[in-house]
Amino acid sequence: MKKFTLGLLALIGVVLLLAACGSNTAAPDSTNGGSDSAEEDLLAKVQEEGTLTIGTEGTYPPFTFHDETGKLTGFDVEIAEEVASRLGVEAEFLETQWDAMFAGLDAERFDMVANQVGINPERQESYEFSDPYITSTAVLVVPKDSEIQAFEDLEGKLSAQSLTSNYAETAKSFGAEIEGVEGFNQAIELLNSGRVDATVNDNLTVLDFLKQRPEANIEIVDEADDAAQSALLFRKGSGPMIEEVNKALAEMIEDGTYEEISNKWFGENVLE
């Protein structure tokens, strides 16, 4: 009996010792892990590697597209390149479809997204944004002579939209059915071919398209009352990185670099 008691006490001692060890090894995770660690890791990673990896479409003029030489360019591309330069690192772009952009950011394929990403409450629940660098409005685009002349006319009509965009939500809010597309260019193709009735998109994008293609058989027939703002997109827990990016954006606005880039692409300041 005495041997049994001693054995039991020894076993209890071992269990308590193991529990204490487990508690000690878990403690650092609760104090050093989580979002603070992620924040520090992203900024440190970018600085150590000397590269800021940026997700973008590359098919969305004038924000991100390929020019006649095949070079990736556009307003968002130049803004992101300037931000990277002011952080002392190189900008590296990874192109992907819009609807895969957020999954790519989640999977850490890139450090941020530069693709005129609109700020909305739903996205803010899952992601973090830099300070805004674009202010724009949604417009309704239809073939010339269409019976659709206002957003209210979208009830029961087919609208070509990127499925996860703010503009898809706008079209649905007016009763439109949605035809999913991979970007603005495909939406315009479907509109020109008569396969859809309309598309809702950014006024800056549509105006640029009409400037490049004045013969296009489409027109803007309505414009949303409220303006939307867009910003650079990050994973949750990127606080220090975003602070540095915001400093760079503020410096660009202060020294006139932002306005120079904006005037180049739009002929005006698109933040005001």
Residue ranges of predicted features:
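C-terminal motif of bacterial Sec signal peptides marking the signal peptidase cleavage site
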Residues: 17-20
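Extended ligand-binding regions for polar small-molecule ligands
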Residues: 22, 77-78, 82-86, 165, ...
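Extracytoplasmic small-molecule ligand-binding "clamshell" domains
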Residues: 33-114
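Short loop->beta-strand "edge-of-pocket" segments that line small-molecule binding or catalytic clefts
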Residues: 50-56, 151-164
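Acidic, polar ligand-binding/catalytic clefts
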Residues: 81, 85, 90-153
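Short helix-initiation/N-cap motifs at beta->coil->alpha
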Residues: 93-103, 146, 163-166, 179-193, ...
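A ligand-binding cleft/hinge motif common to bilobed small-molecule-binding domains
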Residues: 117-124, 170-173, 197-227
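Periplasmic-binding protein-like
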Residues: 135-142, 207-250, 268-272
